[in-house]
A protein has these predicted regions:
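A cross-kingdom marker for long, charged
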Residues: 231-257
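Bacterial Sec-dependent N-terminal signal peptides
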Residues: 1-21
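Cell-envelope/glycan interface and biosynthesis
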Residues: 24-240
Length: 257
Protein backbone atom coordinates (compact mmCIF):
# COMPACT_ATOMS: atom_id res chain seq x y z
CA UNK A 1 0.00 0.00 0.00
CA UNK A 2 2.78 2.40 0.97
CA UNK A 3 4.61 1.70 -2.31
CA UNK A 4 1.40 2.42 -4.25
CA UNK A 5 0.91 5.74 -2.46
CA UNK A 6 4.51 6.75 -3.07
CA UNK A 7 4.23 5.83 -6.75
CA UNK A 8 1.02 7.86 -7.15
CA UNK A 9 2.57 10.87 -5.39
CA UNK A 10 5.71 10.60 -7.49
CA UNK A 11 3.68 10.36 -10.69
CA UNK A 12 1.56 13.36 -9.70
CA UNK A 13 4.63 15.49 -8.99
CA UNK A 14 6.16 14.46 -12.31
CA UNK A 15 2.99 15.46 -14.15
CA UNK A 16 2.92 18.81 -12.35
CA UNK A 17 6.55 19.40 -13.26
CA UNK A 18 5.87 18.45 -16.89
CA UNK A 19 2.93 20.84 -16.99
CA UNK A 20 5.04 23.68 -15.64
CA UNK A 21 7.80 22.93 -18.15
CA UNK A 22 5.27 22.91 -20.98
CA UNK A 23 3.80 26.24 -19.84
CA UNK A 24 7.25 27.81 -19.64
CA UNK A 25 8.21 26.39 -23.02
CA UNK A 26 5.09 27.82 -24.64
CA UNK A 27 5.80 31.21 -23.07
CA UNK A 28 9.42 31.19 -24.22
CA UNK A 29 8.40 30.26 -27.76
CA UNK A 30 5.87 33.08 -27.93
CA UNK A 31 8.53 35.54 -26.80
CA UNK A 32 10.86 34.41 -29.59
CA UNK A 33 8.15 34.66 -32.25
CA UNK A 34 7.11 38.10 -31.06
CA UNK A 35 10.69 39.37 -30.84
CA UNK A 36 12.03 38.05 -34.16
CA UNK A 37 9.18 37.78 -36.71
CA UNK A 38 11.55 38.55 -39.59
CA UNK A 39 13.83 35.62 -38.77
CA UNK A 40 11.85 32.89 -36.99
CA UNK A 41 8.98 31.10 -38.73
CA UNK A 42 7.96 28.77 -35.92
CA UNK A 43 8.79 25.54 -34.12
CA UNK A 44 8.95 21.89 -35.10
CA UNK A 45 8.76 19.79 -31.94
CA UNK A 46 11.96 20.68 -30.03
CA UNK A 47 13.49 22.83 -32.77
CA UNK A 48 13.36 26.53 -33.60
CA UNK A 49 12.82 26.97 -37.34
CA UNK A 50 14.32 29.99 -39.07
CA UNK A 51 13.30 31.55 -42.39
CA UNK A 52 16.67 30.65 -43.90
CA UNK A 53 15.88 26.97 -43.33
CA UNK A 54 18.07 26.49 -40.26
CA UNK A 55 16.70 24.37 -37.41
CA UNK A 56 18.24 24.78 -33.96
CA UNK A 57 17.61 22.62 -30.92
CA UNK A 58 15.52 24.51 -28.38
CA UNK A 59 16.09 22.46 -25.22
CA UNK A 60 18.82 19.85 -24.81
CA UNK A 61 17.21 18.66 -21.52
CA UNK A 62 20.53 18.88 -19.68
CA UNK A 63 21.00 20.13 -16.14
CA UNK A 64 23.98 22.50 -16.19
CA UNK A 65 26.21 24.33 -13.77
CA UNK A 66 26.55 28.08 -14.20
CA UNK A 67 29.86 27.59 -16.02
CA UNK A 68 28.26 25.05 -18.35
CA UNK A 69 25.38 27.41 -19.07
CA UNK A 70 27.81 30.16 -20.05
CA UNK A 71 29.83 27.88 -22.32
CA UNK A 72 27.17 25.55 -23.72
CA UNK A 73 23.74 27.16 -23.44
CA UNK A 74 20.79 25.98 -25.46
CA UNK A 75 18.13 28.45 -26.59
CA UNK A 76 15.90 27.68 -23.62
CA UNK A 77 18.76 28.42 -21.21
CA UNK A 78 19.10 31.98 -22.50
CA UNK A 79 15.44 32.65 -21.66
CA UNK A 80 15.33 31.17 -18.15
CA UNK A 81 16.74 34.10 -16.18
CA UNK A 82 14.01 36.74 -16.15
CA UNK A 83 15.03 40.24 -17.18
CA UNK A 84 12.83 42.68 -15.25
CA UNK A 85 11.90 45.90 -17.01
CA UNK A 86 11.82 49.13 -15.06
CA UNK A 87 13.70 50.28 -12.01
CA UNK A 88 15.12 47.35 -10.08
CA UNK A 89 17.34 46.78 -7.03
CA UNK A 90 20.90 45.59 -7.48
CA UNK A 91 21.12 42.14 -9.11
CA UNK A 92 20.94 39.03 -6.99
CA UNK A 93 24.03 36.85 -6.70
CA UNK A 94 24.93 35.29 -10.07
CA UNK A 95 21.72 36.61 -11.66
CA UNK A 96 22.73 37.53 -15.23
CA UNK A 97 19.60 37.74 -17.42
CA UNK A 98 20.87 37.86 -20.99
CA UNK A 99 24.51 36.90 -20.41
CA UNK A 100 23.78 33.21 -20.94
CA UNK A 101 23.50 32.92 -24.71
CA UNK A 102 23.29 30.28 -27.41
CA UNK A 103 25.81 31.53 -29.96
CA UNK A 104 24.33 29.55 -32.85
CA UNK A 105 21.04 31.40 -32.37
CA UNK A 106 22.65 34.80 -32.92
CA UNK A 107 24.98 33.62 -35.68
CA UNK A 108 22.00 32.23 -37.57
CA UNK A 109 20.27 35.61 -37.57
CA UNK A 110 23.15 38.09 -37.78
CA UNK A 111 26.05 36.21 -39.37
CA UNK A 112 28.62 33.59 -38.37
CA UNK A 113 31.69 35.49 -39.61
CA UNK A 114 32.82 39.13 -39.57
CA UNK A 115 32.24 39.33 -43.33
CA UNK A 116 28.69 37.99 -43.03
CA UNK A 117 27.81 40.48 -40.29
CA UNK A 118 29.36 43.38 -42.19
CA UNK A 119 27.11 42.72 -45.19
CA UNK A 120 24.14 43.88 -43.13
CA UNK A 121 25.64 46.78 -41.18
CA UNK A 122 23.95 50.17 -41.42
CA UNK A 123 25.30 53.52 -40.26
CA UNK A 124 23.22 55.67 -37.94
CA UNK A 125 23.99 59.15 -36.65
CA UNK A 126 24.03 59.04 -32.87
CA UNK A 127 22.76 62.22 -31.16
CA UNK A 128 22.90 64.29 -34.37
CA UNK A 129 21.74 67.49 -32.67
CA UNK A 130 23.97 67.29 -29.59
CA UNK A 131 27.15 65.31 -30.27
CA UNK A 132 27.00 63.71 -33.75
CA UNK A 133 28.71 60.36 -34.06
CA UNK A 134 28.50 57.71 -36.80
CA UNK A 135 27.84 54.23 -35.46
CA UNK A 136 27.47 50.92 -37.28
CA UNK A 137 24.91 48.33 -36.21
CA UNK A 138 23.04 45.60 -38.05
CA UNK A 139 19.87 46.37 -39.98
CA UNK A 140 18.58 42.83 -39.34
CA UNK A 141 15.53 42.80 -37.04
CA UNK A 142 15.45 46.58 -37.38
CA UNK A 143 18.25 47.10 -34.86
CA UNK A 144 19.48 50.22 -36.68
CA UNK A 145 16.02 51.79 -36.57
CA UNK A 146 15.56 50.96 -32.90
CA UNK A 147 18.93 52.44 -31.94
CA UNK A 148 18.18 55.58 -33.95
CA UNK A 149 14.90 55.85 -32.03
CA UNK A 150 16.86 55.59 -28.77
CA UNK A 151 19.09 58.43 -29.97
CA UNK A 152 16.07 60.57 -30.86
CA UNK A 153 14.67 60.23 -27.34
CA UNK A 154 18.01 60.78 -25.61
CA UNK A 155 18.38 64.08 -27.46
CA UNK A 156 15.41 65.33 -25.46
CA UNK A 157 17.44 64.82 -22.26
CA UNK A 158 20.50 67.05 -22.75
CA UNK A 159 21.24 66.92 -19.01
CA UNK A 160 22.39 63.32 -19.51
CA UNK A 161 24.68 64.07 -22.45
CA UNK A 162 27.86 63.29 -20.51
CA UNK A 163 26.75 59.66 -20.14
CA UNK A 164 25.78 59.03 -23.76
CA UNK A 165 27.52 61.72 -25.82
CA UNK A 166 30.69 59.74 -26.42
CA UNK A 167 29.67 56.21 -27.38
CA UNK A 168 32.54 53.76 -26.90
CA UNK A 169 31.58 51.36 -29.66
CA UNK A 170 29.05 49.19 -31.47
CA UNK A 171 30.08 46.52 -34.02
CA UNK A 172 33.33 44.78 -33.11
CA UNK A 173 33.93 41.10 -33.85
CA UNK A 174 35.56 39.89 -30.65
CA UNK A 175 35.24 37.55 -27.68
CA UNK A 176 34.43 38.52 -24.11
CA UNK A 177 37.67 39.03 -22.21
CA UNK A 178 38.69 35.93 -20.27
CA UNK A 179 36.42 33.64 -22.33
CA UNK A 180 36.10 32.14 -25.79
CA UNK A 181 32.49 33.33 -26.10
CA UNK A 182 31.55 35.94 -28.70
CA UNK A 183 30.52 39.36 -27.45
CA UNK A 184 27.18 40.58 -28.78
CA UNK A 185 29.18 43.44 -30.29
CA UNK A 186 30.26 40.80 -32.82
CA UNK A 187 26.74 40.72 -34.24
CA UNK A 188 26.25 44.48 -34.45
CA UNK A 189 23.46 44.46 -31.85
CA UNK A 190 25.23 46.16 -28.94
CA UNK A 191 26.40 49.62 -27.94
CA UNK A 192 28.69 50.78 -25.15
CA UNK A 193 28.04 54.32 -23.98
CA UNK A 194 30.61 56.64 -22.40
CA UNK A 195 33.10 54.58 -20.39
CA UNK A 196 34.12 57.64 -18.37
CA UNK A 197 30.94 57.27 -16.33
CA UNK A 198 30.54 53.50 -16.48
CA UNK A 199 31.52 50.52 -14.36
CA UNK A 200 32.47 46.98 -15.32
CA UNK A 201 32.86 44.06 -12.95
CA UNK A 202 36.18 42.96 -14.48
CA UNK A 203 37.72 46.43 -14.17
CA UNK A 204 36.47 47.07 -10.65
CA UNK A 205 37.44 43.66 -9.30
CA UNK A 206 40.55 43.02 -11.42
CA UNK A 207 39.42 39.51 -12.34
CA UNK A 208 37.82 37.61 -15.21
CA UNK A 209 36.71 34.69 -13.01
CA UNK A 210 32.93 34.43 -13.46
CA UNK A 211 32.59 32.05 -10.49
CA UNK A 212 34.11 34.52 -8.06
CA UNK A 213 31.73 36.51 -5.86
CA UNK A 214 31.64 40.24 -6.52
CA UNK A 215 31.76 42.21 -3.26
CA UNK A 216 30.17 45.43 -4.48
CA UNK A 217 27.78 46.49 -7.23
CA UNK A 218 28.68 49.87 -8.74
CA UNK A 219 26.60 52.00 -11.11
CA UNK A 220 26.53 55.67 -12.16
CA UNK A 221 24.14 55.49 -15.13
CA UNK A 222 20.78 57.26 -14.51
CA UNK A 223 17.77 55.00 -14.88
CA UNK A 224 16.09 57.47 -17.26
CA UNK A 225 18.65 56.40 -19.87
CA UNK A 226 18.04 52.71 -19.22
CA UNK A 227 14.27 53.13 -19.59
CA UNK A 228 14.65 54.59 -23.08
CA UNK A 229 16.85 51.71 -24.24
CA UNK A 230 14.46 49.12 -22.79
CA UNK A 231 11.52 50.78 -24.54
CA UNK A 232 13.22 50.03 -27.86
CA UNK A 233 14.25 46.42 -27.19
CA UNK A 234 17.69 46.82 -25.58
CA UNK A 235 18.59 45.20 -22.28
CA UNK A 236 21.11 46.80 -19.92
CA UNK A 237 24.27 45.19 -18.58
CA UNK A 238 23.73 47.07 -15.32
CA UNK A 239 21.05 44.52 -14.43
CA UNK A 240 23.63 41.74 -14.38
CA UNK A 241 25.43 40.45 -11.30
CA UNK A 242 28.50 40.62 -13.55
CA UNK A 243 27.62 44.25 -14.17
CA UNK A 244 28.57 46.15 -17.32
CA UNK A 245 26.85 49.50 -16.97
CA UNK A 246 28.03 50.97 -20.28
CA UNK A 247 26.54 48.06 -22.23
CA UNK A 248 23.18 47.75 -23.98
CA UNK A 249 22.25 44.98 -26.41
CA UNK A 250 19.21 44.31 -28.57
CA UNK A 251 17.39 41.40 -26.92
CA UNK A 252 13.66 41.95 -27.42
CA UNK A 253 12.84 38.35 -26.47
CA UNK A 254 13.78 39.20 -22.88
CA UNK A 255 11.55 42.28 -22.85
CA UNK A 256 8.51 40.76 -24.58
CA UNK A 257 5.36 40.49 -22.46
Amino acid sequence: MMKTVLYICSSFLSLCSFGQDTAHTAQYRQKLLKAYPDCITGFDKNYVVFKNGTRLLFDDRKVKTLTEQYSNADIEDQLKAAYIKGKTPKPAEFDDPGRIRNDSFFKCMYGATPAAVKQNLATITWLPGLAPQSLQVTRINGVDKQLQAVSDELEKLPAFLKYVGKAAGTFNWRVIKGTTRPSTHSYGIAIDINTDFSNYWQWDNKTTDENRKIPDYVNRIPFEIVAIFEKHGFIWGGKWYHYDTMHFEYRPELLAD
